């Protein structure tokens, strides 16, 4: 009977690694490749063993990572008491108005409708329901009538929003500890919304029908100049960078590095979006920790669709003004039927051709885009990777397996990286994203290892930091492959 390496055998055999005969790095790599091939062979991949394998495997970076979406609901609930807020037990929303909170606290306990987090934790039924509102927990095994998954996903941010920007230093420390625990050395997190202001006249002008391109550029230039001369607005940018610096103090060390993207919300008014972009680009140009700019928010809602091309022109304008600032854009996070077909025909192409995106987030509607092959060729030739988020693409869009455009990107040579998106909302890990990839698509160890390296190569890190982490990744993989090779040898001594 052929002896197979099981997860239990691998775990037991790791104790033999320290005394195993030293093998060459190349032979260790070959042994690891053979071991991995056995895990994905056949009709049913060995997912438990893949989970162990990827938990152990060094992972370079997580490049599509929303800070607020990465924090688990349990930690947000802890922050409710820290901020002296309460949670409405009927709506499950956080009440931050101090007068309302004080009035609730003055009532007898039986009459309160707004509870402390301690009281929520003590009520098992209420706590379970809150977790289902504040994350996607139990969605697939819950029998009640539910809102659609995309609504459920995006609604979570409204529940924990009042505390999402509090205690950021604690939040980043938690994310660092969790990353180190799963052998992840770098996170590039979409951290905080950049400041913005409203300008009704600007909104009316840029949304005017038939506005010539030159007129739009003039409007953008004029308002940029006004914003640069606005002392209050400039102070808000300085305060933004101060918050990044204070929150991130002590995060970077020999084992872990984190960098930050400023982001704008695509469903706000044009003046709010553009002023937020101006602030984000300025912040990134001044602070080496802020390595890029992103645009986020549900792409399928009316304002996001209406203003998509306008937003790309705004990015183009600011990219010219700040050529060294990198941009990673959520583009094509759409599924057939979400919007009319013409709405799926150009988003990725405009992000690449107009905005000048350095990375594309999601890129899910590529099969429906005009000149999809041409766009993918440009992405391949310009080394513009796609940030692939398998869990959220399945949950929000209902797209997985062979329906996922990762099959197209792989076929046509477009680089891609594996990332988490919102691991706290989806209650997931980067290791599990690799498990999903390996179990759903035919792959080999060489591709898996390349993906780990690419998640650093395509990061927005300064070149010196990038080379430092790549060198460290070499050493980490050498140790990992030696472990796997030794465990493989040791497992042959273990009876099945």
Where are the regions that the model predicts?
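Gram-negative bacterial Sec-dependent N-terminal signal peptides
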Residues: 1-21
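Metal-cofactor-binding active-site regions of metalloenzymes
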Residues: 23-496
